[in-house]
């Protein structure tokens, strides 16, 4: 995490220099940026710790609750009107997540709770990103995100201990992660800031597809019928909310 955060920070630092944009500290004291950064720190720390203990397919399924959480937060704190249909859909979506993780099962890992904490952090981050003023550039916000990601690695290092040196194969993967991660941060931040949340949200569900494929094919994880049913409930609820929002805003 530390190396990835530092590497990505240098990428954005270079892009900022190329655009002639100064690194300002004043945005760090903006309330919306502070909210976004707090969510980023919570999400990054908890998700990376969860990756060491929780199957990636489970992580992908739980993260799909983020659009549901955003809708709930918009209703509770941002004054958005959410009718009974969307409220019920939110409940169904969370029920689907419970079906997937199966908390009563003998194989349930309590570390799964870290993924829910990360989902809450992502929700806080996305809401904060939406509230950030247009006067703050996406590159600058992305630079802050990478610095926070490296800081999260330092925090985890204090608790876990131990530092390992990467070999040649890991170094290649690390460089690929820096490149792809930097692009992902830019595109994600830009989409959330400029796009309509109801349009952006459905694309989040592709993460579950990728995590399931990676978990089953690459990591040899097992997915049962109950987990697939839970995934269908969560995705179906999210897509219903998205469709309902489009209908109401038409």
Question: Language model features by range: what are they?
Answer:
Residues 3, 60-65, 132-148, 185-216:
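Helix-helix packing/entry segments at the starts of transmembrane helices
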Residues 6-35, 84, 136, 147-175, ...:
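Membrane-interface interhelical linkers
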Residues 13, 37-45, 67-72, 97, ...:
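Hydrophobic/small/kink-forming positions within alpha-helical transmembrane segments
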Residues 27-37, 82-94, 111-116, 135-148, ...:
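Cytoplasmic-side transmembrane-helix entry/capping segments in multi-pass membrane proteins
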Residues 47-49, 66-88, 209-228:
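C-terminal transmembrane-helix exit sites in multi-pass transporters
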Residues 85-102, 226-245:
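Hydrophobic transmembrane alpha-helices of multi-pass small-molecule transport proteins
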Residues 95-107, 157-174, 216, 220-225:
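Membrane-interface helix termini and inter-helical loops of multi-pass transporters
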Residues 106-131, 250:
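Glycine-/small-residue-enriched transmembrane alpha-helix faces in small-molecule transporters
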């Amino acid at each position: 995490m530390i190396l990835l955060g530092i590497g990505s920070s240098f990428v954005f630092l270079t892009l900022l220099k190329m655009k002639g944009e100064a690194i300002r500290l004043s945005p760090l004291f903006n309330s919306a940026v502070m909210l976004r950064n707090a969510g980023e720190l919570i999400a990054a720390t908890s998700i990376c710790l969860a990756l060491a203990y929780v199957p990636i397919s489970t992580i992908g399924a739980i993260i799909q609750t983020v659009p549901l959480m955003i809708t709930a937060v918009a209703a509770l704190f941002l004054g958005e009107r959410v009718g009974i249909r969307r409220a019920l859909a939110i409940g169904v979506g969370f029920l689907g997540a419970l079906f997937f993780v199966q908390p009563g099962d003998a194989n349930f890992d309590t570390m799964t709770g870290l993924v829910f904490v990360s989902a809450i952090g992502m929700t806080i981050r996305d809401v904060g990103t939406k509230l950030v003023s247009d006067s703050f550039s996406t590159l600058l916000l992305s630079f802050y995100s990478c610095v926070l990601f490296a800081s999260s690695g330092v925090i985890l290092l204090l608790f876990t201990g131990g530092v390992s040196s990467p070999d040649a194969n890991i170094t290649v993967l690390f460089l690929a992660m820096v490149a792809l991660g930097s692009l992902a941060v830019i595109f994600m931040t830009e989409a959330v800031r400029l796009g309509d949340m109801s349009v952006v949200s459905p694309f989040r569900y592709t993460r579950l597809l990728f995590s399931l494929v990676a978990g089953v094919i690459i990591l040899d994880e097992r997915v049962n019928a109950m987990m697939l049913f839970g995934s269908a409930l969560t995705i179906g609820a999210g897509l219903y909310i998205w469709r309902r929002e489009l209908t109401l805003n038409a």
